[in-house]
């Protein structure tokens, strides 16, 4: 009977939306449900989702800030076209329920589901409500959230995390017998972050052999960052464009320096890894800052605003911590984790389908 039930996941744009959706998809498939995916052809989901054996179809939709007059004028037209495309796909696939996991595609996808009479469930990963989910919550049968207090009456489930990350050993096991320089993992999202790429090599020069760095640079700054490390004669650091096995990187690290996307914050909490967060400054609602606050309040992380993120500031912060302190911070991070988020999101869907 379950095999006849079909769930359409709508998510795209970044790993922060796609990876939680894939975690839920994997769980549902393992429990006998059919999963299909609605995304965009020019973003990460177009390559990632098919690797998991999931059928995916695409609509055309982009994000606009809407500041310019001509953008404001044509944006409704493009949104209506995207909704039309999504409706055609929904009528073709005939899903029993739609799960919106965020990204620009989720707006037209969610509205198309509602206008087609298909039940919609949405999940908000960030601590601050996104504009799309704010509107979609009006039409949704269930609203789920990754952080407490985002929506006033939503169900708190946490953010679904990949199984490989859930399997990372706890901090006490990882730190046992660990000696040598402090291991610093630097991640600025899949595209890298220019402020981290610019500042971290200068920090490395100041602290020299006190630490070893695994630095995900991204594509754009890669050659410049390689040159910066060569200039200071520190060739022992690991400099890469992208880290394929993030679970291995988390297990290796003593501390993370990164942006504060919702998924990164949730993964850090699950793994138990202290962090220095440098929130992205171009979100009007400062969502990354607020994502990081629970870990800061737990004593597991620090926030350095981008304007204050200098090699002197971050060097002083790292020098003030030893491995014993970092291990204690890691345990505090785990104390606020939501390790069962994938199961909780999936069970909400399954229970609704039983009605």
Curated annotation (Swiss-Prot):
Pathway: Cell wall biogenesis; peptidoglycan biosynthesis. This is UDP-N-acetylglucosamine--N-acetylmuramyl-(pentapeptide) pyrophosphoryl-undecaprenol N-acetylglucosamine transferase. It is found in: Cell inner membrane. Cell wall formation. Catalyzes the transfer of a GlcNAc subunit on undecaprenyl-pyrophosphoryl-MurNAc-pentapeptide (lipid intermediate I) to form undecaprenyl-pyrophosphoryl-MurNAc-(pentapeptide)GlcNAc (lipid intermediate II). GO terms for cellular component: plasma membrane. The keyword Membrane applies. Keywords: Cell cycle, Cell division, Cell inner membrane, Cell membrane, Cell shape, Cell wall biogenesis/degradation, Glycosyltransferase, Membrane, Peptidoglycan synthesis, Transferase. One of its GO terms (biological process) is cell division. Belongs to the glycosyltransferase 28 family. MurG subfamily. It catalyses: di-trans,octa-cis-undecaprenyl diphospho-N-acetyl-alpha-D-muramoyl-L-alanyl-D-glutamyl-meso-2,6-diaminopimeloyl-D-alanyl-D-alanine + UDP-N-acetyl-alpha-D-glucosamine = di-trans,octa-cis-undecaprenyl diphospho-[N-acetyl-alpha-D-glucosaminyl-(1->4)]-N-acetyl-alpha-D-muramoyl-L-alanyl-D-glutamyl-meso-2,6-diaminopimeloyl-D-alanyl-D-alanine + UDP + H(+). InterPro entries: GlcNAc_MurG, Glyco_trans_28_C, GlycoTrans_28_N. The keyword Cell cycle applies. It is a peripheral membrane protein. Pfam families: Glyco_tran_28_C, Glyco_transf_28. GO terms for molecular function: UDP-N-acetyl-D-glucosamine:N-acetylmuramoyl-L-alanyl-D-glutamyl-meso-2,6-diaminopimelyl-D-alanyl-D-alanine-diphosphoundecaprenol 4-beta-N-acetylglucosaminlytransferase activity; undecaprenyldiphospho-muramoylpentapeptide beta-N-acetylglucosaminyltransferase activity. Its EC number is 2.4.1.227. Gene3D superfamilies: Glycogen Phosphorylase B. UDP-N-acetyl-alpha-D-glucosamine binds at residues 14-16, 126, 162, 190, 243, 262-267, 288. It comes from the Bacteria. The gene is murG.
